[in-house]
Amino acid sequence: MTPSKSTKFIREWLRVTAEVPARAVPGMREQDTGPMDSGRKRDGSRSSLVWDVLADVMAARVAESGRTALDVVDVGAGTGGLAVSIASRGHRVTVVGPSPDALAAARWRAAETGVTLTEVQGEASDLPALVGEPATGAAGAEGNGADLVICHNVLEYVDSPEAALAAIARVLRPGGTVSVLAANPIAAVLQRALAGKYAEALAMLPGGVTESTGASATGQATRGQASSRQAPSVTRRFTLPELTALIEGAGLRVGDAHGIRIFSGLLPGAGADLATVEALRELEDAAATCPPLRDIATRLHVLAHRA
């Protein structure tokens, strides 16, 4: 592909993906629909609560370390929407992913925004080799390792969630944070049942097997399951106890947990007018940390920290 054709392809891809709901695009994340700004009004169906949480995490790390520029690694960064937003705040961001096309799109998005990303092709389980491990006691030092690792909509697709989280733990600096966002099987059951798709809902129950992927509804993909580059369907989903167990198994301390898209995931088409959007946003934000509502959200967001 010539440079001019490649440029046109990436521009068109970014235009199309910006117009399609994130869940309709294989491997694409909610944040890839565009840069997020914690100061703008949020669409209740695409809450930027995650961004607000991350902004607080970064601000606390800056204050703690005394460094204005943090080192951030975004695993499975998609087309770079979140990575660019973080880089726009002056932080050094490395995006890691298996797809050269997605990395090229992230590079293009960064150039259009006037920021710089470091793109590295590879898998989450290879992070220590790709970005390096921090030296012992390097909590505030620049160099290898990361202050923050973004792991959003990744664990559903990797061959081994355990290996991915173990690798992430190894690249975190002491006191560093990982932000995990993953699909929730409970929400999948509710959404299908409310849509009248009872057989699909039954298959999505814990211990059931989804028809579209042949994967266990919670935690594990079946033998021979294709990776996210081969199939658009979510291969795994995690309840909050499963997600926290995975994180703790990697030697990390579990922090705050939020439910993302609790009600909007059950109300397709909600938010037709601004008043409804704002009311839904306020409800989503208030319920995000309130169990059991938090625990039925479309996606679960968990922060974890390295000691």
Predicted regions and their residues:
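Conserved alpha-helix/loop element of class I SAM-dependent methyltransferases that forms part
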Residues: 44-68
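Conserved class I S-adenosyl-L-methionine
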Residues: 68-76, 177-208
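A conserved beta-strand element that flanks and buttresses the S-adenosyl-L-methionine
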Residues: 150
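A short glycine-rich, Lys/Arg-flanked "PGG" loop and its adjoining helix->strand segment in the class I
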Residues: 162-177
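Short alpha-helix
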Residues: 234-251, 257
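Conserved Class I S-adenosyl-L-methionine
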Residues: 256-307
